[in-house]
A protein has these predicted regions:
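Short C-terminal tail/terminal secondary-structure segment
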Residues: 2-11, 159, 237-238, 249-262
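Conserved glycine-rich cofactor-binding loop
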Residues: 19, 26-27
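Conserved glycine-rich Rossmann-like NAD(P)H-binding loop of the short-chain dehydrogenase/reductase
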Residues: 40-56
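Substrate-binding pocket helix/loop in short-chain dehydrogenase/reductase
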Residues: 81, 110-111, 115-123, 149, ...
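Active-site helix of classical SDR
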Residues: 134, 170, 178
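Alpha-helical segment proximal to the catalytic Tyr-Lys
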Residues: 139, 183-187, 246
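Residue(s) in the substrate-gating loop at a strand-loop-helix junction
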Residues: 154
Length: 262
């Protein structure tokens, strides 16, 4: 592994001249992360669901003067996922320095009634697509001895949750996958880490936000006194994408307002 650069601390966080590929970036946490990486100097390739006309993230990145490209792909379609990295490389001039796997879906149902189709969809999007993209990134980054891979995990990487067996299984496995890849690739100067969001005010948590009882129960347990917002991930993602985290390997950074400390 290369040593941390001997430059002034602010420069450690610069992503100038780098390119990032990010999934799940048309809204919520993913959009905030994509914009933050662009603010730090990176050019961005977004993975977007086919048929989506949401250009808000792309427009925000372009307004910063960065190059932004879009690859349309359904992350539940394994064959489509296998083609993403190659398309991104072509779009970004043959170099990807940073991969952020942020896309995720949720399906809720009691375990005894949980549909097999929902299980397959959640596992494919939340775990298999991450594995395939990380593998493709590793094939590109390891020979070049440079790269950062950031996998979005969850509180359910550590806890079991309720009525979300597929999501818990996928996120638990993702934490271990992050460590497994880090064990192999850290010596090749490719750092693999994760971020585990706490309770964040996004569309995925809309049902919880609309349930007065659960909203109160959750809110009372968060030491920070509030739910997280997408912008709370700007600093963590830039840190893990930059030279500032050069010696951080195989970690899952929990961004939860103190939830896991209770």
């Amino acid at each position: 592994m290369d040593p941390t650069p001997s430059v002034p601390a602010p420069q450690l966080f610069s992503l100038a001249g780098q390119t990032a590929l990010i999934t799940g970036a048309t809204r919520g946490i993913g959009a905030a992360c994509a914009i933050a990486l662009a603010e730090a100097g990176a050019n961005i390739c977004l993975v977007r669901r086919p048929g989506s006309t949401n250009d808000e993230t792309a427009n925000a990145i372009a307004a910063l003067g960065r190059t932004v490209k879009i690859v349309d792909a359904d992350l539940a379609d394994v064959d489509a996922v296998k083609g993403i990295f190659g398309k991104a490389l072509e779009a970004m001039g043959g170099e990807i320095h940073i991969l952020v796997n942020c896309a995720g879906i949720q399906r809720r149902s009691p375990a005894v009634q949980f549909p097999e189709s929902d299980w397959d969809d959640v596992i494919n999007v939340n775990l298999k697509s991450v594995w395939l993209l990380a593998q493709a990134a590793g094939q590109h980054m390891v020979p070049r001895r440079r790269g950062k891979i950031i996998n979005f995990c969850s509180l359910l990487t550590f806890q079991g949750g309720f009525t979300v067996p597929a999501y818990a299984a996928a996120k638990g496995a993702l934490g271990q996958l992050t460590k497994a890849l880090s064990n192999e690739w850290s010596k090749e100067n490719v750092q693999v880490n994760g971020i585990a969001p706490g309770y964040i005010a996004t569309d995925m948590n809309e049902k919880l936000l609309q349930d007065p009882v659960r909203l109160r129960q959750i809110s009372e347990r968060i030491p920070a006194g509030r739910w997280g917002e997408p912008r709370d991930f700007a600093g963590p993602v830039v840190f893990l994408a930059s030279a500032a985290s050069q010696y951080v390997c195989g970690e899952v950074l929990v961004v939860d307002g103190g939830w896991m400390g209770r």
